[in-house]
């Protein structure tokens, strides 16, 4: 029988592929190439200090917070400052306490400033009101200004006048509606001679009282090493005076009195950031000591300290979410050898770069030609699902998260070390959670795409039933003619199985008959070949025996 081989119509289920080299990690695999991916780790910054939501930072340049608040004469540019979004202080500012000494509860004051956005400096005790004490001429070479000795602008160093230091009793009532930051100090002389030279009285004290504060200070007269030419020391203190409260001062010497105080006119999220950067005339929603971040990503690895609406800091170097499919384009040689097919679900070997308008779809071939068609419905559902998942992750993580530095004094080093260990532990947990989240979501996304391809395959299989043959590679070979209209009905789910079932049945029987005829022919040929081979072997054996008998090599006896 002569059998003519005619190529049958086919439809294949496949998925999109492209030239992407994006790679992601999953729970089970590393470096999986995918068609589309989204980086969720911000790694870049602009290297500048920027406005935060349109409000400028207070950049103290070479001044410290203490130098600014007390009025170091080298910090005159900050005598009156507008509203700020955050405060920038260098790690070791040159203009700190110009007169050597200490600022009591300095770290606590800085913490207080992290909730303030604006001060109004107001006069509370004018320098001219100290008529019984020397208040105007006492300066120090430790606080130079334009080559001359000077002193802090916002406090007054009171010295004896006419060999007398009368006891001071002075009050200030806070009649404002806002809290008031008040600063004062005490001078610790080098020796007893300096004590009487400045204050006349050998034994002195300073008393300070409010509704919440009861303080009594006495000078510590001791010889110390010279710093900036000074053997004496100054110690400064502060308090918050509530509205309708009063602060009372009493002293008979060594008193550094407040002249100005700071009215806290606006509270809000702020921070004191340690940075050496310059102002960049820019705007941002997130600032770090390294520079500003303008990103909608949920994580960053730039610096653990931030201010504003910032991504969460993690120690990771790479966090990439898969949004597309596994990317394994078919090789051209395979396409020529085995036809166009693809998918993911275990039996489909590669993606289609020719299908560009969807993630999943079909390739058909019939007498009218061949072509790709994306399955728009399943693709759109998949896009919506993946997009919603990515947006949900970003929304949950990309909330305002400020991580400002905390400062501790020398007596709190153990607390500081413990705090650092706790913060490092939190960062490790955040990093682990972020990396695990990405691995799990990538695994789910790729499984999601696998499932969608499998569902599309099953949709076609259930329609065609025995009207087509599964080829095992994502393709179906029709037992009937399937023109373009027929192909479209398969794709849109309206395939009419009964319409083609009779033609398909005849085709199946025809194929089965050809197989049976072929099997019978092969059996006859096999028997003929066996018999012929046996006869040929018998003739050869008989001929050999006669030849051996004729030359005496074999004796033949006939009985």
From Swiss-Prot:
Q: Which residues are glycosylated?
A: 18-19, 31, 162, 294, 492
Topological domains, Cytoplasmic? 545-559
Q: InterPro entries per the record?
A: Capsid_hemagglutn, Hemagglutn_HA1_a/b_dom_sf, Hemagglutn_influenz_A, Hemagglutn_influenz_A/B
Topology relative to the lipid bilayer, per the entry, is: Single-pass type I membrane protein
Query: Which coarse location class describes where this protein primarily resides?
Result: virion
Query: What ranges does the Extracellular topological domain annotation cover?
Result: 1-523
Disulfide bond annotation, renumbered to this chain: 12-475, 50-282, 63-75, 98-143, 286-310, 482-486
- Could you list the residue ranges that cross the membrane? 524-544
Name any GO cellular component annotation: membrane
Q: Which GO terms describe its molecular function?
A: host cell surface receptor binding
- What happens to this protein after translation, modification-wise? Palmitoylated.
Q: Where in the cell is it found?
A: Virion membrane; Host apical cell membrane
Q: Organism's domain of life? A: Viruses
Secretion signal span: none
Q: Report any one BP term from Gene Ontology.
A: clathrin-dependent endocytosis of virus by host cell
**Which positions are lipidated as S-palmitoyl cysteine?**
549, 556, 559
**Name listed for the protein in its UniProt record:** Hemagglutinin
What lineage is this protein's organism placed in?
Answer: Viruses, Riboviria, Orthornavirae, Negarnaviricota, Polyploviricotina
